[in-house]
Amino acid sequence: MASSRRLRALITNDDGIDSPGLWALADATRDAGFDVVVAAPHRDASGVGASVFAVRGEDGVAVHPRELPGLDGVPAYAVEGHPSFIVYASGRGWLEPKPDLVVSGINLGANVGRSVLHSGTVGAALTAGLQGWYGLAVSLDTGWTPPEHPHWEAATAGLPEVFDLLLSRDPGTVLSYNAPDVDPAALRELREAELAEFGTAQVVVEHREAGPGGATHGTLRSSLHEVGEQPSPTSDVGLLAAGHPTVTELRSVAAVPGVLGGVVVTSAH
Protein backbone atom coordinates (compact mmCIF):
# COMPACT_ATOMS: atom_id res chain seq x y z
CA MET A 1 0.00 0.00 0.00
CA ALA A 2 1.09 3.56 -0.66
CA SER A 3 2.73 5.35 2.24
CA SER A 4 0.75 8.26 3.69
CA ARG A 5 3.87 9.79 5.25
CA ARG A 6 4.85 11.77 2.16
CA LEU A 7 1.37 12.76 1.04
CA ARG A 8 -0.26 16.15 1.43
CA ALA A 9 -3.93 16.28 2.39
CA LEU A 10 -6.26 19.22 1.82
CA ILE A 11 -9.05 19.19 4.41
CA THR A 12 -12.27 20.93 3.41
CA ASN A 13 -16.03 20.66 4.00
CA ASP A 14 -19.37 22.26 3.18
CA ASP A 15 -20.42 23.06 6.77
CA GLY A 16 -17.90 25.89 6.98
CA ILE A 17 -14.58 26.65 8.61
CA ASP A 18 -16.10 26.81 12.11
CA SER A 19 -17.44 23.25 12.11
CA PRO A 20 -15.98 21.03 14.87
CA GLY A 21 -16.31 18.14 12.42
CA LEU A 22 -13.77 19.82 10.15
CA TRP A 23 -11.36 20.29 13.05
CA ALA A 24 -11.74 16.65 14.13
CA LEU A 25 -11.09 15.45 10.59
CA ALA A 26 -7.98 17.60 10.18
CA ASP A 27 -6.62 16.37 13.52
CA ALA A 28 -7.25 12.70 12.68
CA THR A 29 -5.73 13.07 9.21
CA ARG A 30 -2.64 14.69 10.70
CA ASP A 31 -2.41 11.84 13.23
CA ALA A 32 -2.49 9.39 10.30
CA GLY A 33 0.79 10.91 9.11
CA PHE A 34 -0.32 13.27 6.37
CA ASP A 35 0.96 16.80 5.78
CA VAL A 36 -2.27 18.71 6.39
CA VAL A 37 -3.60 22.05 5.15
CA VAL A 38 -7.15 23.22 5.86
CA ALA A 39 -9.20 25.38 3.49
CA ALA A 40 -12.96 25.55 3.89
CA PRO A 41 -15.84 27.92 3.04
CA HIS A 42 -16.10 30.95 5.30
CA ARG A 43 -19.72 30.05 6.00
CA ASP A 44 -22.09 27.11 5.51
CA ALA A 45 -22.25 25.90 1.90
CA SER A 46 -24.31 22.73 2.30
CA GLY A 47 -26.09 21.32 -0.74
CA VAL A 48 -23.98 23.08 -3.37
CA GLY A 49 -22.79 19.88 -5.06
CA ALA A 50 -19.71 20.47 -7.22
CA SER A 51 -20.38 24.18 -7.68
CA VAL A 52 -17.30 26.33 -8.22
CA PHE A 53 -19.09 29.54 -7.25
CA ALA A 54 -17.05 32.09 -5.33
CA VAL A 55 -17.59 35.66 -4.17
CA ARG A 56 -15.36 37.70 -6.44
CA GLY A 57 -14.48 41.24 -5.46
CA GLU A 58 -12.32 43.71 -7.33
CA ASP A 59 -9.18 41.93 -6.16
CA GLY A 60 -10.50 38.35 -6.54
CA VAL A 61 -11.80 35.86 -3.99
CA ALA A 62 -11.07 36.72 -0.36
CA VAL A 63 -9.01 34.25 1.70
CA HIS A 64 -8.84 34.70 5.49
CA PRO A 65 -6.02 32.98 7.45
CA ARG A 66 -7.37 31.23 10.55
CA GLU A 67 -6.08 29.47 13.64
CA LEU A 68 -8.18 26.43 14.47
CA PRO A 69 -8.65 24.79 17.89
CA GLY A 70 -6.25 21.90 18.51
CA LEU A 71 -4.47 22.42 15.21
CA ASP A 72 -1.40 24.42 16.16
CA GLY A 73 0.98 24.73 13.24
CA VAL A 74 -1.58 23.63 10.65
CA PRO A 75 -2.16 26.29 7.96
CA ALA A 76 -5.87 27.08 7.73
CA TYR A 77 -7.90 29.39 5.52
CA ALA A 78 -11.51 30.51 5.33
CA VAL A 79 -12.33 31.01 1.65
CA GLU A 80 -15.29 32.96 0.29
CA GLY A 81 -16.18 30.20 -2.14
CA HIS A 82 -17.76 26.77 -2.40
CA PRO A 83 -15.87 23.56 -1.52
CA SER A 84 -15.25 22.49 -5.13
CA PHE A 85 -13.96 25.97 -5.95
CA ILE A 86 -11.43 25.56 -3.13
CA VAL A 87 -10.32 22.18 -4.48
CA TYR A 88 -10.14 23.50 -8.03
CA ALA A 89 -8.13 26.56 -6.97
CA SER A 90 -5.74 24.33 -5.04
CA GLY A 91 -4.73 22.62 -8.26
CA ARG A 92 -4.43 25.78 -10.30
CA GLY A 93 -1.55 27.49 -8.56
CA TRP A 94 -2.90 28.51 -5.17
CA LEU A 95 -1.41 25.76 -2.98
CA GLU A 96 2.15 24.60 -3.44
CA PRO A 97 2.83 21.79 -3.23
CA LYS A 98 -0.51 20.65 -4.58
CA PRO A 99 -2.52 18.18 -2.51
CA ASP A 100 -2.22 14.46 -3.16
CA LEU A 101 -5.63 13.87 -1.70
CA VAL A 102 -8.68 15.83 -0.57
CA VAL A 103 -10.47 14.77 2.61
CA SER A 104 -13.88 16.43 2.91
CA GLY A 105 -16.06 16.52 6.04
CA ILE A 106 -16.88 15.45 8.65
CA ASN A 107 -20.32 16.28 7.34
CA LEU A 108 -23.04 16.77 9.96
CA GLY A 109 -25.44 14.20 8.55
CA ALA A 110 -25.04 11.15 6.34
CA ASN A 111 -24.42 11.43 2.60
CA VAL A 112 -26.27 8.43 1.23
CA GLY A 113 -28.25 7.32 -1.79
CA ARG A 114 -28.16 8.93 -5.20
CA SER A 115 -28.74 12.32 -3.59
CA VAL A 116 -24.99 12.47 -2.87
CA LEU A 117 -24.97 14.29 -6.23
CA HIS A 118 -26.12 17.41 -4.39
CA SER A 119 -23.68 17.26 -1.48
CA GLY A 120 -20.94 19.87 -1.26
CA THR A 121 -18.95 17.42 0.86
CA VAL A 122 -19.07 14.79 -1.89
CA GLY A 123 -18.66 17.42 -4.63
CA ALA A 124 -15.28 18.41 -3.22
CA ALA A 125 -14.09 14.79 -3.24
CA LEU A 126 -15.32 14.24 -6.80
CA THR A 127 -13.55 17.41 -7.94
CA ALA A 128 -10.34 16.02 -6.44
CA GLY A 129 -10.81 12.85 -8.47
CA LEU A 130 -11.20 14.86 -11.68
CA GLN A 131 -7.80 16.40 -10.99
CA GLY A 132 -6.18 12.99 -10.58
CA TRP A 133 -6.01 13.14 -6.77
CA TYR A 134 -7.50 10.80 -4.22
CA GLY A 135 -10.81 12.02 -2.81
CA LEU A 136 -12.54 11.01 0.41
CA ALA A 137 -15.89 12.31 1.65
CA VAL A 138 -16.51 11.66 5.36
CA SER A 139 -19.98 11.96 6.92
CA LEU A 140 -21.61 11.24 10.28
CA ASP A 141 -25.15 9.85 10.32
CA THR A 142 -26.62 12.21 12.91
CA GLY A 143 -30.24 11.90 11.74
CA TRP A 144 -32.69 14.69 11.04
CA THR A 145 -31.96 16.69 14.17
CA PRO A 146 -28.21 16.92 14.84
CA PRO A 147 -27.34 16.22 18.48
CA GLU A 148 -25.65 18.77 20.69
CA HIS A 149 -22.54 16.59 20.95
CA PRO A 150 -22.03 14.45 17.83
CA HIS A 151 -19.71 11.45 18.08
CA TRP A 152 -17.09 12.78 15.68
CA GLU A 153 -14.76 10.07 16.98
CA ALA A 154 -17.08 7.44 15.47
CA ALA A 155 -16.06 8.73 12.03
CA THR A 156 -12.38 9.27 12.81
CA ALA A 157 -11.97 5.83 14.44
CA GLY A 158 -12.13 4.06 11.09
CA LEU A 159 -10.08 6.55 9.10
CA PRO A 160 -6.77 4.61 9.17
CA GLU A 161 -8.48 1.59 7.59
CA VAL A 162 -10.26 3.77 5.02
CA PHE A 163 -7.05 5.64 4.16
CA ASP A 164 -5.27 2.32 3.56
CA LEU A 165 -8.14 1.19 1.35
CA LEU A 166 -8.12 4.45 -0.60
CA LEU A 167 -4.36 4.55 -1.13
CA SER A 168 -4.28 0.95 -2.31
CA ARG A 169 -6.22 2.05 -5.38
CA ASP A 170 -5.23 4.26 -8.31
CA PRO A 171 -4.98 8.06 -7.98
CA GLY A 172 -8.27 9.63 -8.97
CA THR A 173 -10.23 7.17 -6.80
CA VAL A 174 -13.07 8.75 -4.79
CA LEU A 175 -14.64 7.10 -1.76
CA SER A 176 -17.63 8.11 0.33
CA TYR A 177 -17.37 7.01 3.97
CA ASN A 178 -20.30 7.22 6.40
CA ALA A 179 -20.29 6.36 10.10
CA PRO A 180 -23.19 5.96 12.54
CA ASP A 181 -23.37 8.59 15.28
CA VAL A 182 -22.63 6.20 18.15
CA ASP A 183 -19.92 5.58 20.71
CA PRO A 184 -16.97 4.07 18.78
CA ALA A 185 -17.17 0.95 20.97
CA ALA A 186 -20.62 0.27 19.51
CA LEU A 187 -19.50 0.38 15.87
CA ARG A 188 -19.85 -2.78 13.81
CA GLU A 189 -17.42 -3.76 11.05
CA LEU A 190 -16.85 -1.56 7.98
CA ARG A 191 -18.95 -2.68 5.02
CA GLU A 192 -18.92 -1.80 1.34
CA ALA A 193 -22.31 -0.35 0.42
CA GLU A 194 -24.28 0.24 -2.73
CA LEU A 195 -26.05 3.57 -3.13
CA ALA A 196 -29.68 3.45 -2.09
CA GLU A 197 -32.18 4.67 -4.67
CA PHE A 198 -33.27 7.25 -2.12
CA GLY A 199 -31.86 8.84 1.01
CA THR A 200 -33.27 8.78 4.52
CA ALA A 201 -35.53 11.74 3.78
CA GLN A 202 -37.21 13.35 0.80
CA VAL A 203 -37.50 17.08 0.14
CA VAL A 204 -41.03 18.27 -0.55
CA VAL A 205 -41.46 21.75 -2.07
CA GLU A 206 -44.64 23.78 -1.58
CA HIS A 207 -45.53 26.87 -3.60
CA ARG A 208 -47.21 29.56 -1.50
CA GLU A 209 -48.97 32.34 -3.31
CA ALA A 210 -48.08 35.92 -2.51
CA GLY A 211 -50.56 38.03 -0.60
CA PRO A 212 -52.46 40.96 -2.12
CA GLY A 213 -50.12 43.54 -3.57
CA GLY A 214 -47.13 41.25 -3.28
CA ALA A 215 -44.10 42.09 -5.40
CA THR A 216 -43.45 38.39 -6.21
CA HIS A 217 -45.47 35.43 -7.42
CA GLY A 218 -45.08 33.79 -4.04
CA THR A 219 -42.46 31.63 -2.37
CA LEU A 220 -41.19 28.06 -2.57
CA ARG A 221 -40.98 26.44 0.87
CA SER A 222 -39.11 23.15 1.27
CA SER A 223 -39.39 20.62 4.08
CA LEU A 224 -38.06 17.15 4.83
CA HIS A 225 -40.32 14.11 4.98
CA GLU A 226 -39.32 10.62 6.03
CA VAL A 227 -39.10 8.09 3.19
CA GLY A 228 -41.61 5.32 3.75
CA GLU A 229 -39.89 2.62 1.67
CA GLN A 230 -37.57 0.15 3.36
CA PRO A 231 -33.98 0.40 2.11
CA SER A 232 -32.07 -2.59 0.77
CA PRO A 233 -30.05 -4.19 3.60
CA THR A 234 -26.92 -3.96 1.39
CA SER A 235 -27.40 -0.25 0.69
CA ASP A 236 -25.66 2.58 2.52
CA VAL A 237 -28.94 3.52 4.22
CA GLY A 238 -29.66 -0.04 5.33
CA LEU A 239 -26.15 -0.80 6.58
CA LEU A 240 -25.88 2.46 8.54
CA ALA A 241 -29.21 1.71 10.21
CA ALA A 242 -27.75 -1.65 11.26
CA GLY A 243 -24.77 0.07 12.90
CA HIS A 244 -22.15 -0.46 10.17
CA PRO A 245 -19.81 2.25 8.91
CA THR A 246 -19.98 2.14 5.12
CA VAL A 247 -17.68 2.89 2.22
CA THR A 248 -18.70 3.35 -1.41
CA GLU A 249 -16.57 4.12 -4.43
CA LEU A 250 -18.04 6.94 -6.50
CA ARG A 251 -17.49 7.76 -10.17
CA SER A 252 -17.70 11.27 -11.51
CA VAL A 253 -18.60 12.60 -14.96
CA ALA A 254 -17.48 10.34 -17.81
CA ALA A 255 -18.49 9.77 -21.43
CA VAL A 256 -20.25 6.48 -22.25
CA PRO A 257 -19.48 5.22 -25.78
CA GLY A 258 -22.03 3.59 -28.08
CA VAL A 259 -24.89 6.08 -27.91
CA LEU A 260 -25.44 5.85 -31.67
CA GLY A 261 -25.29 2.05 -31.68
CA GLY A 262 -23.05 1.85 -34.72
CA VAL A 263 -25.24 4.15 -36.82
CA VAL A 264 -23.20 6.26 -39.24
CA VAL A 265 -24.22 9.90 -39.00
CA THR A 266 -23.57 12.19 -41.94
CA SER A 267 -23.48 15.96 -41.82
CA ALA A 268 -26.70 17.71 -42.73
CA HIS A 269 -26.58 20.22 -45.58
Residue positions per predicted region:
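A cross-family phosphate/adenosyl-ligand binding-site feature
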Residues: 2-9, 19, 23-93, 97-98
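Short beta-strand segments
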Residues: 12, 39-41, 104-107, 137-139, ...
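Short glycine-rich anion-binding loops that position phosphate/pyrophosphate groups of nucleotides
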Residues: 15, 44, 82-83, 107-110, ...
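Electrostatically charged, flexible surface regions
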Residues: 48, 150-269
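Alpha-helix C-terminal capping segments
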Residues: 90-96, 123-134
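Short, Asp-centered acidic motifs that coordinate Mg2+ and/or phosphate
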Residues: 101
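Glycine/threonine-rich flexible loop motifs
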Residues: 110-119
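Glycine-rich phosphate/pyrophosphate-binding loops
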Residues: 129-154
